[in-house]
Amino acid sequence: MMIKKLVTFEDLGFVQWGVLNEDETGVYSAIALEEAFFTPFPETLFEFVEQGNEGLLALADSLEQNERTGAVKAKPLGTIHILPPLPELHKNIFCVGENYAEHIEEFHKEKGRPLPKFPQFFTKAPTCVIGTEAAIDSHPTVTKELDYEGELAVIIGKTGSDIPVSEAMDYVYGFTILNDITARDLQRNHVQWFHGKSL
């Protein structure tokens, strides 16, 4: 069974994680799957990601058993609160600036600058991450130019360095969507983007 979407959510004040059902109307709780099929799962999705393929195989097995037995019912999305997938990150979020070719050409042509030869990296503080449909704080006393950009976020599943391009995807656990919120005025006022990217 292909596991497509893992989520962290809050249900009756209790934070837990699970997997979306096939029609994406509800979530199978990892706790409920563990109780039904005696498969131990870690408490957080972060810890589950650290298990790599071993964890995914165990989860797939539990979901297949549930498909046969119907022992665990999905919690309807309307009854739970979806949180960021990994709400307690241990490091900053690393980003690649100017990552869209047409946008780069347009931006540098407009400014009369040559195209960059190397990628531009910046980080965002993990404290600025919020969940799906959560209200974005506009910080009106700090910025007058809040902006947003839809980005593809890559979840790295294991440590490594000096990784050959041919092996890069072996280190990718999965993907999610990130709404990159930026205070453009703060970004312009500082050579380092961190402040404008981390409200």
Placement of each model-derived feature along the sequence:
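N-terminal non-catalytic cap/leader segment that marks the start of a structured domain
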Residues: 1-115, 119
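Glycine-enriched loop-and-adjacent helix/strand subsegments that border the catalytic/binding cleft
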Residues: 90-199
